């Protein structure tokens, strides 16, 4: 189906900031092209974290096969290397059935790792790392993310503001070498990229995107987000887990601990999500391979582009 013997597997990648409509576009394209949807969002891999990660609705999931959602528990440290392995396996399986893989997500690091591999980077410095870990505990991961944005904006744009492990690592590399981690990654040229990719980015006006984000967060709280977080805590998952430090979960944990009001938590989730979306856009805009499209306005032309690509 559009892949000649010996040629690379064709892969459509739908990117864009949070709340831009990626999940629905992925399903509609999969229906039009005879495809399966593959998750590329670092938070949607976790079981039991549904509302706060804005997983595709049961109605969307019922329309076409979805892969790599709900695959690990929240206390598992699921890395970009883990993702590359699992996604590669799933894409091979989809292709073997004569179906077409449609990758969808906002985690730039996952997508970059899948299609290009992991770049070599310097070793570790235990002293520097210990100091950064202490800063993360006292100031919070978001403060370190702001610090990273000053010295390595490309890495900061790619990482969740609460992704403490990777933020600490990026700062550690810079403090050790004086060189941004993103530069090490940029210098890493991939001898054999395994996929022939069509990257589609959903273009959204910033004001419209921020409005969508605010509405989505209100909807999340109305649909039981606080109860979801409370259930995870009651199940024994620590608020200190990497997954529980994600935007939304961290703020609701603070509300449940009594350190802020419900309204304050909601407003913080909205603000932090808007900031994250802005950084996602910064990251995606730097990729000249992304073809920007308007959705849902131009679905027919998007579908035509994808069909022509698959052949």
Curated annotation (Swiss-Prot):
Pfam families associated with the record: IPPT (PF01715)
Site feature: Interaction with substrate tRNA: 107, 129
Annotated InterPro entries: Dimethylallyltransferase, IPT, P-loop_NTPase
Keywords in alphabetical order: ATP-binding, Magnesium, Nucleotide-binding, Transferase, tRNA processing
Single GO molecular function: ATP binding
Recorded superkingdom: Bacteria
GO biological process: tRNA modification
Cofactor: Mg(2+)
Binding site for ATP: 16-23
Span list, region Interaction with substrate tRNA: 41-44
Residues annotated to bind substrate: 18-23
EC number of the protein: 2.5.1.75
Catalysed transformations (reactions): adenosine(37) in tRNA + dimethylallyl diphosphate = N(6)-dimethylallyladenosine(37) in tRNA + diphosphate
PANTHER family: TRNA DIMETHYLALLYLTRANSFERASE
Family to which the UniProt record says this protein belongs: Belongs to the IPP transferase family.
Assembly: Monomer.
General function of this protein: Catalyzes the transfer of a dimethylallyl group onto the adenine at position 37 in tRNAs that read codons beginning with uridine, leading to the formation of N6-(dimethylallyl)adenosine (i(6)A).
Protein name: tRNA dimethylallyltransferase
Source species of the chain: Geobacter sulfurreducens (strain ATCC 51573 / DSM 12127 / PCA)
